Amino acid sequence: MSTKNKKAAGGNGGAPKQTRQQSHDSQDYSSFKTVLFYCMLIVFLPVLTFFVLKGFVLDQFLDISEVKVNIASAVGAVVALHVALGLYIYRAYFGAPGSKASKTD
């Protein structure tokens, strides 16, 4: 029997390797989505918090000076940044539910 016939008779000898590769690709894509989400949260949440506090909350409803509005908005943005970083660190440390690290050889 030639090697060509052996491969044809062997069925799907490459299927487990293909499935394993798809599994790794799926895990990589899931990790990429998670990191991208937290990066966007860390970048955009403080900026949005600053402008929402400044433009809609503090200027509209409170009668305080412009400097105090800017300071309060900046403090709110720093708090929002720390919350986003805390969420990322919590997720990185404790991991997602059901995502146990498993070693496959």
Curated annotation (Swiss-Prot):
Signal peptide: none
Entry's localization field: Endoplasmic reticulum membrane; Endoplasmic reticulum-Golgi intermediate compartment membrane; Cytoplasmic vesicle, COPII-coated vesicle membrane
Pfam families reported for this sequence: VMA21 (PF09446)
One GO term (biological process): vacuolar proton-transporting V-type ATPase complex assembly
Cytoplasmic side: 1-36, 90-105
Lumenal side: 58-68
Transmembrane segments: 37-57, 69-89
Sorted UniProt keywords: Cytoplasmic vesicle, Endoplasmic reticulum, Membrane, Transmembrane, Transmembrane helix
Record membrane topology: Multi-pass membrane protein
Domain of life according to the entry: Eukaryota
Disulfide bonds: none
GO cellular component: endoplasmic reticulum membrane; endoplasmic reticulum-Golgi intermediate compartment membrane; ER to Golgi transport vesicle membrane
Region listing for Disordered, in residue ranges: 1-26
Family that this chain belongs to: Belongs to the VMA21 family.
HAMAP family xref list: VMA21
Described purpose of this protein according to its UniProt entry: Required for the assembly of the V0 complex of the vacuolar ATPase (V-ATPase) in the endoplasmic reticulum.
Protein's name in the database: Vacuolar ATPase assembly integral membrane protein VMA21 homolog
